Every structure is written in C-alpha cells, then in structure tokens.
Amino acid sequence: MNGWIVKTLGLLLITSLLLTGPGVAKASETSTFSDISGHKYEALIEQAAEDGWVNGCPDGRFWPDRPITRLEYAKMMLAALNIVPGSQRAKEVLQSTEVPKEVLSLADDGWASKEGWVELGFASGLVVLGDYGSYLVLPHDEGISRYESTIFAVRMLGRFEESLTMVVEEPPFDDLVPDMQVDNFGVIEIAVENGLISGYTETKFYPAESFTRGEAVATVSRVLTLLGRN
C-alpha cells in the first residue's frame, strides 16, 4: 500500500512538473500585453517594454490603437532616452537648462506634473510652449496629431532647427497646405526621408489625424535606431 502511494505521488509530481514546466511557462509569456498578439507593431512594443520605456495599463493591455496624448508621447521619448525623473541624466538636463517659472506655473497637478515629466519635457526641448500659439496652458491631455508627433520625433532626433531652414518647394504630400495646421514642411520632409513616419497613402499624410500608441512606439524605436541606441 505504501509503495502504491509513493508511486502515485511520484506520478503526480512528474505530471505537475510537466504542466508547469518551461513549455507551459513559455506559452503564457508569449506576449507582455494581452492585446498586441498579431498586431503590426507587436515586436516593437515587446522590445520597448523589455527595454523599460513603455508600460501598459492595469488591465494588462497596451491599447496599441488608442490615441496617445502629448505628454504620454513626451514621456515615452524621455524614458527611451533614459531621461527619467530622479535619474542622473534627468538631473543633468535640469541643471543645463533653466525652465522658466512661468512655464512651470502653467503645469497642473496631474500625474505628469507630480512625477516631474512636465519639467523634463520643457527642459529637454521636446516640448516647446510656443508650439501652441496663444494657449496659456499646455493642452497636454489632448491626443497628439500626426503632424505634431512628427515635430516631436524630429526634435528627439536633434534635427528640428535644421527643419526650420529647409526650403521645401513642393510638399511631399498633396494634403499639406501652409496654414495653421501645418507650418513646417521641413519636419515632415526629414521624418519621411529617414523613415520615421510615412503617409497613409503615397499622396496623403492626414496631418490632423490622431497618432496611436502603437505608432508612437514604432516612431520612437526608429529614432533610437538612427541615434545608434537600438
């Protein structure tokens, strides 16, 4: 009887090991987030999460097709550059650039301000208040447009000043017109030439369309590659 019990326990132990072994664990770890399997940017999102510059929502999803806000995008870029509140790199950025008090006074008491991302966004030069015309506050909770996201990306690449001096005789897409919506064709030219972003079609850019979290990860990943950090 005792021998039978021992054999039974042994079989149960072996079965348990098989069920919880590497094969099963691997299946449960195929994706960091529950909603990106098969997504166009799945591999890039996985890599970004592994590198520590993106995270998902409390429900375990990443929401790759959800529009990203201005400060969410700025935070993603700063984290990708290792400019994280409290880090040595962040301290160096804050010491090298004095953020005007009037700018800090515009920040609300939301998560980005409390955690220090707003100050870093301005200090790093990724966020420039003048981009928002007569706004007295940074409209950070609004979804960022494709055109504005391109400005952020070219700033992260370090080529924004260059874009201001470029002479673009013919816009790269036929839905780009010189108005309040698009006032710098140079950033789009630089972004497209370097593969940071592309048009929806060969002739349409849709500058006012929202920019998604998945697209944001893809763009930041491409900038990092150009900077030699990937």
Language model region names:
Residues 4, 18-40, 55-74, 78-117, ...:
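Feature responds to low-complexity, polar/acidic, surface-exposed segments characteristic
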Residues 45-48, 77, 121, 189-191:
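A short amphipathic alpha-helical interaction element
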Residues 52, 195:
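Phosphate/pyrophosphate-binding loop motifs in nucleotide- or prenyl diphosphate-using proteins
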Residues 10-20:
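Bacterial N-terminal signal peptides
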Residues 1-9:
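Bacterial N-terminal signal peptides that target proteins for export
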